[in-house]
From Swiss-Prot:
Belongs to the Lgt family. It comes from Idiomarina loihiensis (strain ATCC BAA-735 / DSM 15497 / L2-TR). This is Phosphatidylglycerol--prolipoprotein diacylglyceryl transferase. The lineage of its organism: Bacteria, Pseudomonadati, Pseudomonadota, Gammaproteobacteria, Alteromonadales. A 1,2-diacyl-sn-glycero-3-phospho-(1'-sn-glycerol) binds at R144. Coiled coil: none annotated. InterPro entries: Lgt.
């Protein structure tokens, strides 16, 4: 029987309201809407101070990014975390009603969309990345809040005062790792990027900071997050999430060093 010494997960219905038949509006779907709404708002705000971008160009980029994050997120979730399901039934890729999105897959989808956009508009890929990077962290914040409301992706067993019992997490208190991610990958990373942008930076610096910041935050939180049951811990005792973030950290450092060399010294 759960002890009263720890927090109980708030009884939040994942369904915000029912529309008709199988159609529901879920909190997680609302989180995606909030993420894209904030990205659109902040991107439009950036066009006012960045002479290299017009509102029309950004709106076009948002459309490409939306397609990229949805397709990439679902494909990545299927291939990275449920490849065995996909092999047994390739149609599992389209079981969107069952949920399941991967940030790393979504990131790859956005990168592909950015590449196609940059090529079409004859822009520097890294310049596009620098414009997009500040738009992402708050989307991560809303997404992780959605995970928390769904009572999914909870953390490892814990005895800290703020540990929590999750309905699907068994009889042990756990880290609310979704909230850790919302704070680190979302609010903190957004604040760091805004602070970093106050001074002129070389092309690719902001993109690099995002990759590095997200990678480090996710790598740390994975120590508190319960590994996927069907994967467990992989080589060197690291989770799939940690292995997927290592290339991001390395690439982020490379981009930041490269960008710094572009700036005049002294």
């Amino acid at each position: 029987m759960p002890s009263n010494d720890y927090w109980q997960f708030p009884a939040i219905d994942p369904v915000l309201f029912h529309i008709w038949g199988p159609l529901d509006i879920r909190w997680y779907g609302l989180a995606y809407i909030a993420a894209f709404a904030f990205a659109y708002f902040w991107g439009m705000r950036q066009t006012k101070t960045d002479p290299n971008w017009s509102k029309e160009e950004f709106s076009d980029l948002m459309f490409w990014g939306f397609i990229g994050v949805i397709l990439g997120g679902r494909i990545g979730y299927t291939l990275f975390y449920h490849f065995d399901y996909f092999i047994d039934n390739p149609l599992y890729l389209f079981y969107i009603h069952e949920g399941g999105m991967s940030f790393h897959g979504g990131l790859l989808g956005v990168i592909a969309a950015m590449y196609l956009y940059a090529r079409k508009k004859q822009r520097s890929f890294l310049q596009v990345g620098d414009f997009v990077a500040p738009l992402v962290p708050m989307g991560l914040f809303f997404g992780r809040i959605g995970n928390f409301i769904n009572g999914e992706l909870w953390g490892r067993a814990a005895e800290v005062p703020w540990a929590m019992y999750f309905p699907s997490g068994g009889p042990v208190p756990r880290h609310p790792s979704q909230l850790y991610e919302a704070l680190l990958e979302g609010l903190l990373l957004f604040a760091v990027i805004l602070w970093f942008q106050r001074k002129p930076r070389g092309v690719g610096a902001v993109s690099g900071l995002f990759l590095l910041g997200y990678g480090v935050a996710r790598f740390i939180v994975e120590f508190f997050r319960e590994p996927d049951a069907h994967l467990g811990l992989l080589s060197l005792g690291m989770s799939m999430g940690q292995w997927l973030t290592l290339p991001m950290i390395i690439l982020g450092i490379i981009l930041m060093v490269r960008a710094k060399k572009q700036l005049p010294t002294g």
